[in-house]
Amino acid sequence: MIKRVKTGIPGMDEILHGGIPERNVVLLSGGPGTGKSIFSQQFLWNGLQMGEPGIYVALEEHPVQVRQNMAQFGWDVRKYEEEGLFAMVDAFTAGIGKSKEYEKYIVHDLTDIREFIDVLRTAVKDIGAKRLVVDSVTTLYINKPAMARSIVMQLKRVLAGLGVTSIFVSQISVGERGFGGPGVEHGVDGIIRLDLDEIDGELKRSLIVWKMRGTSHSMRRHPFDITDKGIIVYPDKVLKRKAVIELE
């Protein structure tokens, strides 16, 4: 039997037929405003409620801002940080020189993937982390897209070896096909894509599981909502996107 990690996101584990297989690295890709950060933060918070320590690697926002964003949903991680069950890795303020005063785990040079991996490894071992989020992994290869797959593979090898189940947030531009970064989809175990589509003059949220190693899963596109308590997915509903006809 494959051990599974429950996302705890209402409706999501049904779509994944029980949860994410343990040690999988999942690419969570989507355009701006699709709910990627909320999804990944909810995954970590739910892990804490199940007694599974977690790590959030902040590359897009200041760790202080991340804590505030999470608290808006009622996910106050500070208590867990004090208890050594949750850790924030600051890979955002690299180069500003302010970080040392606040954060325990800091990445100083984002171009040095070995340093990045060393900081993650230390944090994982310190708190016995079971879940980890990198938000966003795209930042690591934004200036060197040819390195995307290699970087993802290096991270995956280390994190899976440490027994961690990970979500890598991946940014794509509006309307872009694919999952962000050349070849990254081949370097991960799972892909969940979040979309925001205009249907009949209204923006609708939906997600689809493109692949998930070690489990069967729903092959349909399911609608979801972002509420004041986080994301709710509707496994019994299917969203049909209007076909876009391209004229010659």
Swiss-Prot record:
Pfam families: ATPase (PF06745). Keywords: ATP-binding, Nucleotide-binding. InterPro entries: KaiC-like_dom, KaiC_dom, P-loop_NTPase, UPF0273_KaiC-like. The keyword Nucleotide-binding applies. SUPFAM superfamilies: P-loop containing nucleoside triphosphate hydrolases. Belongs to the UPF0273 family. This is UPF0273 protein TK1590. It comes from Thermococcus kodakarensis (strain ATCC BAA-918 / JCM 12380 / KOD1) (Pyrococcus kodakaraensis (strain KOD1)).
